[in-house]
Amino acid sequence: MMKLREIAHSRTGDKGNTSNISVIAYHEKHYPLLLAQVTSARVKAHFAGVVEGEVVRYELPNLSALNFVMSGALGGGVTRSLALDAHGKSLSSALLDLEIEDAPNP
């Protein structure tokens, strides 16, 4: 097992009560691993208790990236939330802690 951060980096954005996280493979060869193991269901489970709505995954193969749009993730949004991280920027780092299976050695 390894952490997602070993093969990818991430960026976070927000709009209202919705957060989106892009997960970008460092190398194109790791994109199939992202596709297979970083599913909407796994992301939703990883953020249990944080994300109240659905998690939708968008695939960006030309960028070797995935984008997850998570509804109900920001406690009502920046203007309504009392959270220290109202924009949800720390969610990207938290997602990179997701455990995935090691890439097979060629």
Q: How does the language model describe each region?
A:
Residues 1-106:
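Long, contiguous binding/interaction regions
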